[in-house]
Amino acid sequence: MNNSAGHYRAGRAVAVVALFAGATIWGLIWYPYRAIEAAGISGALASALTYAVALLLGLIVFRGKLRGARIDGWLVAIALSSAGCNLGYVLGMLHGEVMRVLLLFYLAPLWTVLLARLILAEPLTRAGAALVGLSLTGALVMLWRPELGAPWPTAPGEWIGLAAGFLFALANVLIRRAHHYSIELKSMAVFVGVVVVGLGYVALAEPLAVPQAGADIWLLVVVVGVVLLAINLVVQYGLMRIAAGRAIVILLSELVVAALAAWWLAGETMGLREWLGGALIVAASLVSAKIET
C-alpha cells in the first residue's frame, strides 16, 4: 500500500516537473529562433526546418504506433490549424515584443469558449461568460492607445500573435472533436502541417536563396528540432497525469519565464497597462482551467 502511494506521488512529481520543463522551454524558444533569423534563415524557413527535424525523429520514435493510421478531413484541419498556430507563434515572437505577443496569444481561452459553442455546441456557462469578459477586458487594457482611440494591435507581430492564439484554440477544439486519434498521430500531423505550411509560405512570399549560415547555426536548427519533439512528449506525459486545473497553473509559468528572458536577453520591459492587462488575461486562463475541470 505504502509502495503504491509512494509510486503515485513520485509519478505526480515527475509530471509536475515535466510541465514546468515544457513551460520553461516555450518561454525561451523564441531566443534561438531569433539567433537563427539573425544568421540569415527566415523565421518561416527556420520553423519548417526545425519541425522537419522533429518530424523525422518522430517517425522513427512512433513508427510502430503510426502503422495503419487513417487520414481524414478532421486530421487535415488539425494539421493546418496547428501549423498556423506554431508558425504564427514563432513569427510573432520574431517581429514583436515577446510579452505583448505572448499575452495576445494567451487570449486563446476566449476563442476556445466561442469556438466550442460553434463547433461542439457546448453551452456558454456563467464561467465561460466570465472568461470572455476577463479576456476582452485584459486585451482592451493592454492594447488601448489614446492617440488612436482604439484598442488594436499596433505591430505586425502582435496581429500574428493574436491570430496564432485563435488558431491554437481552433486546433484544441478540433482535437476534442476528433478524439479518436492517438496522441502520436496528432503530434505527427502538427509537425507535417508546420513543415508544409512553412515551406509553402517561403516559396510564395520569400526570395528563393540558399541560406549562408554557419555550421553552428545548422546545428542549432537540429537541436531546436530535437527539443520540439522532446517537449511535445514531456508535456503530453504531464497532461495525462495532472488535473487540467493544476496543469494550466503550471503551464502559465511560461509567462514568467518569457518575461524574465525578454528582460534579460532582449532588454524588453512591460509598462503598467501591460501588467494589468496581462493579469486579467492570466485570470481568464485560470477560469478556463476551472471550466475544463
Short names for language-model regions:
Residues L102-L107, I175-G193, L229-W264:
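Helix-helix packing/entry segments at the starts of transmembrane helices
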Residues L19, A23, G27-A35, G58, ...:
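Transmembrane alpha-helical segments that form core, pore/gating elements
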Residues N2-G6, A54-I71, T137-W152, V194-I217, ...:
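Membrane-interface helix-cap regions at the ends of transmembrane helices
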Residues L28, K65-R100, F105, V141, ...:
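Specific transmembrane alpha-helical segments of multi-pass solute transporters/efflux pumps
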Residues F62-G64, A108-A130, V256-W275:
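C-terminal transmembrane-helix exit sites in multi-pass transporters
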Residues W144-R145, I248, L252-T293:
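C-terminal-most transmembrane helix of multi-pass membrane proteins
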